[in-house]
Amino acid sequence: MEISPLTTIVSVRRNGKVVMGGDGQVSLGNTVMKGNAKKVRRLYHGQVLAGFAGATADAFTLFERFEQQLEKHQGHLVRAAVELAKDWRTDRSLSRLEAMLAVANKDASLIITGNGDVVEPEHGLIAMGSGGGFAQAAALALLQHNAELSAREVAETALNIAGSICVFTNQNLTIEELDSAV
């Protein structure tokens, strides 16, 4: 699946917190259509953070399906993610959706792709979308060389750096935070 992830989503785990943030830019081709979209939200009674990169309408469908899986599996993040990925691969209507999800709860952070992949990234760090490489490099540098920064500060700084480099990412951020077991 070829996704045009014209956004940046970052999730960071540090010092008992998990943070997920995203920029607010929606682009259509080379035109900015909206600058204050909310691409990160809370699901399952506020216990799960979810963000998307890719087609907005497709992402809302995936949020809905993922939340149904969370309800079905009593909030078990990994099980819900695996079941969504299986559905995404096998259901013809879902297989056409062009988006990726980043999801996190107090225990785990995962990336779910339309190829059926469920990946738990290293370092408790997710960075995806068009500015994901910039954000990941910035976040890793901050995590490795500045122990005083909070998870929120790392995520915000990484997103702002990505927004200053990537033309499909702005600096109008949505940030959500949970206490983490890890």
Swiss-Prot record:
Active site: T7
Keywords linked to the UniProt accession: Allosteric enzyme, Cytoplasm, Hydrolase, Metal-binding, Protease, Sodium, Stress response, Threonine protease
Enzymatic class: hydrolase
Key word Hydrolase present: yes
Regulation: Allosterically activated by HslU binding.
Protein name: ATP-dependent protease subunit HslV
Function according to Swiss-Prot or TrEMBL: Protease subunit of a proteasome-like degradation complex believed to be a general protein degrading machinery.
Annotated positions binding Na(+): G163, C166, T169
GO BP terms: proteolysis involved in protein catabolic process
Annotated family: Belongs to the peptidase T1B family. HslV subfamily.
Subunit structure: A double ring-shaped homohexamer of HslV is capped on each side by a ring-shaped HslU homohexamer. The assembly of the HslU/HslV complex is dependent on binding of ATP.
UniProt-annotated location(s): Cytoplasm
